[in-house]
Amino acid sequence: MSEQQEQEQSDKQKYEFRKVIEELKGYQGSGTQLVSIYIPEGKLISDVVAHVTQEHSEASNIKSKDTRTAVQDALTSIKDRLRYYDVRPPDNGLVVFSGAFDTGGGRTDMVTKVLESPPDPIESFRYHCDSEFLTEPLEHMLADKGLFGLIVLDRREANVGWLKGKRVEPVKSASSLVPGKQRKGGQSAQRFARLRLEAIDNFYQEVAGMANDLFVADRHEIDGILVGGPSPTKDEFLDGDYLHHELQDMVLGKFDVAYTDESGLYDLVDAADDVLAEHEMLRDKELMEDFFKQLHNGDKATYGFDQTRQNLNMGAVEQLLISEDLRKDVVAYTCENGHDEYDLINSSAGTDDHECSRCGATVDADDGEREDAIDHLMELADQRGTETVFISTDFEKGEQLLTAFGGVAGLLRYSTGV
């Protein structure tokens, strides 16, 4: 599978998970009766069933009859679902949600959802019972991923590590032999200053060596390098060209950080929040810039569901741009005279009868075939060798894609006049 195909598969999986998360976040229990269970892939299913059985027994002590019944029903449903799995969960683990949610008017309904093989591995077993489903761990998995090198240093110590997605991984550390500013007796001021500068230089070389050993081999995978520490130290380190020249060119910024132990790596990520957010959206911004250039000065852009769909069918779309906040369904109608037409509707809206624009024949709402608009477009894109890219709404032109262009656009291989 090519890198582009892997990225598209990952984007599609993330979209499917995002839809489920949004649905789960919409459920509200009247008490602590919504159960969430996160199961890592190494966990024995039999151990999970035993845990659920124990929770079911303990739930009999809940004073509220409604809450007690709801929790026990949820746990029974979870046990039933777990029977479909063998010894262990699938790759990356398994998440099960179950519980009774309010539907209004004092009524409730039951929901059970099973999410297999999330985008990232589930790190630990977790049982959670509350008035809301626990979705935060999954939301973190859907955050934009990147690989960044981290360096924090002062003249006493240094730490280097990785930022992988949202996870900081400290890897190497070093302590310096740089003497304090007060010289020992018997040393001339000039000799002390020279020895101190040599010690500083040696320490900077040691830090650069750690960084080079860690980062150079992966330099083609790294999105950038962040450097933190007190102002004089980090400036001297970067201005002195101690880093490998290819790494030096990858430095995204330097940041004031008070601590240079392992905790300083976390402080560095916090200090670089704006830079990281900007970098995550860089590709989205470049694609939207290309789209607007073609829209105003060229003829290789299309937008809107109908036009983009036509261009997809022609095989003319190089890159399909979809707003990550698009929530629409497409309803396909075929009238009695064989005309195929499509309506784009809100995901929460009902389906209406359709009047064919070509012959005026009416198609009953029940005869329309409804599916998620993004799934519909991505299937066409897969068939035509078109790359699908989800565009964030966290910048101006990304927001415009959703609000002004219907959430769907495309960069074309050639002009079609459509």
UniProtKB/Swiss-Prot annotation:
GO CC annotation, single: cytoplasm
Keywords: Cytoplasm, Protein biosynthesis
Chain segments annotated as coiled-coil in the UniProt record: none
HAMAP family registered for this protein in UniProt: Rel_fact_arch_1
SMART domains, per database record: eRF1_1
Gene Ontology molecular function: any one: translation release factor activity, codon specific
Native source organism of the sequence: Haloarcula marismortui (strain ATCC 43049 / DSM 3752 / JCM 8966 / VKM B-1809)
Subunit details: Heterodimer of two subunits, one of which binds GTP.
Tree of life domain: Archaea
Protein name per its UniProtKB record: Peptide chain release factor subunit 1
Recorded family membership: Belongs to the eukaryotic release factor 1 family.
Database matches in Gene3D superfamilies: 1.20.5.170, 3.30.1330.30, eRF1 domain 1 (3.30.960.10), eRF1 domain 2 (3.30.420.60)
Role summary: Directs the termination of nascent peptide synthesis (translation) in response to the termination codons UAA, UAG and UGA.
Compartments, as annotated in UniProt: Cytoplasm
Keyword tRNA processing among UniProt keywords: no
Underlying gene: prf1
Pfam families: eRF1_1, eRF1_2, eRF1_3
